[in-house]
Amino acid sequence: MFGTLASGEIETARLNRNLGITSNLGVSCGGFEDFAMRFEGENMVPYKGEEQEEEEDQVVVNETTPFQFQQPLFLQQQQKLVVGYALTSKKKKSFLQPKLELLARRKGIFFVAIDLNRPLSEQGPFDVVLHKLLGKEWEEVIEDYQQKHPEVTVLDPPGSIQRIYNRQSMLQGMADLKLSDCSGSLFVPKQMVVLKDSAASADAVVEAGLKFPLVAKPLWIDGTAKSHQLYLAYDRRSLAELDPPLVLQEFVNHGGVMFKVFVVGDVIKVMRRFSLPNVSNCEKAKVDGVFQFPRVSSAAASADNADLDPRVAELPPKPFLEALVKELRSLLGLRLFNIDMIREHGSKNVFYVIDINYFPGYGKLPDYEQVFVDFFQNLAQVKYKKRQHCK
């Protein structure tokens, strides 16, 4: 079989006669107009336009003359990209939506599930490995694969991911980011780690200069719902109700709005989410104990269309975000992450980073599918240019 040809003005009978093909000829209208290609099994089959079909009218195929097809230059430069993925079932369901897979296929990007029961090096070949699995064993598998296949882009390196799964190391180095020339100031809330005996940590909290109320977060992010549970501790005695290991972070009033900054390579998208309301001095004096609050980053908590005070709702300045993300990509060594930011209440451009997440819930982001298709296309172009340079 020589390939699948797109239907056009040429009649099937004339194709059969000129090419000497009988039942082996497949005729299809194609479905990949953007790249003019179809994917069948493991083969990319070129879509042929009217110009090329006219040229083929002059081709005579017989037993001694093999059929050859020369792709136009613009088709030769558009490369197929195979993305092997290793995701939890929940992440696969939320990320690999039908629309994403359809748009990707139209651009020559194909997602292939990695079989966790087989050696990774025996699978593929892959151009990109996209993963979000926890555990030392998987981390070792990916690191070994990277050493054996340096030509494959791994999103993202396990060592870099591990750093932000620990809330103590997650925000380290933020103070050293070079943002002095930007239209905003960046801080991290004062925090401390409690490894055991939360009740006995009350004195350490005072010594560290932290002021109540405190946001309490589990130290480790392990993919469970419990690792994302957040509490607000109003006084010293309430610390005894918390289970270590955990991070205690000073609560910063921020008008009840949080900014989720999504990063996909060089692309930045920002969404507003409802968060905890401000805590007044009067409330601090009257309220005690621990308050467990829901995950304020949930899709239901979107504040993008809410009627908010403009001083609270105004997004962080674009130059500030661009500089911050550029520095963080370098510091963290990640390309897929999001930043949870708040603006200090009463200020215009004083911001705090309170959390960083690897490979977050992009499915909540409008038009995330096109963002990722563009991202993978860029990876394909970079790989193509590297191959051309090495020739």
From Swiss-Prot:
SUPFAM superfamilies: Glutathione synthetase ATP-binding domain-like. Residues 178-384 form the ATP-grasp domain. Its cofactor is Mg(2+). Keywords: ATP-binding, Kinase, Magnesium, Metal-binding, Nucleotide-binding, Transferase. Its EC number is 2.7.1.134, 2.7.1.159. GO terms for molecular function: ATP binding; inositol-1,3,4-trisphosphate 5-kinase activity; inositol-1,3,4-trisphosphate 6-kinase activity; inositol-3,4,5,6-tetrakisphosphate 1-kinase activity; magnesium ion binding. 1D-myo-inositol 1,3,4-trisphosphate binds at K90, K132, H228, K260, N357. It comes from the Eukaryota. ATP binds at residues 167, 217, 249-260, 275. Expressed in seedling roots, cotyledons, rosette leaves, cauline leaves, stems, flowers, siliques and seeds. Mg(2+) 2 binds at D355, N357. Pfam families: Ins134_P3_kin (PF05770), Ins134_P3_kin_N (PF17927). Binds 2 magnesium ions per subunit. The keyword Chaperone does not apply. Signal peptide: none annotated. Disruption phenotype: Distorted seed coat with reduced mucilage content and decreased suberin and cutin composition. Crumpled columellas. Kinase that can phosphorylate various inositol polyphosphate such as Ins(3,4,5,6)P4 or Ins(1,3,4)P3. Phosphorylates Ins(3,4,5,6)P4 to form InsP5. This reaction is thought to have regulatory importance, since Ins(3,4,5,6)P4 is an inhibitor of plasma membrane Ca(2+)-activated Cl(-) channels, while Ins(1,3,4,5,6)P5 is not. Also phosphorylates Ins(1,3,4)P3 or a racemic mixture of Ins(1,4,6)P3 and Ins(3,4,6)P3 to form InsP4. Ins(1,3,4,6)P4 is an essential molecule in the hexakisphosphate (InsP6) pathway. Plays a role in seed coat development and lipid polyester barrier formation. Belongs to the ITPK1 family. This is Inositol-tetrakisphosphate 1-kinase 2. It comes from Arabidopsis thaliana (Mouse-ear cress). The lineage of its organism: Eukaryota, Viridiplantae, Streptophyta, Embryophyta, Tracheophyta. The gene is ITPK2.
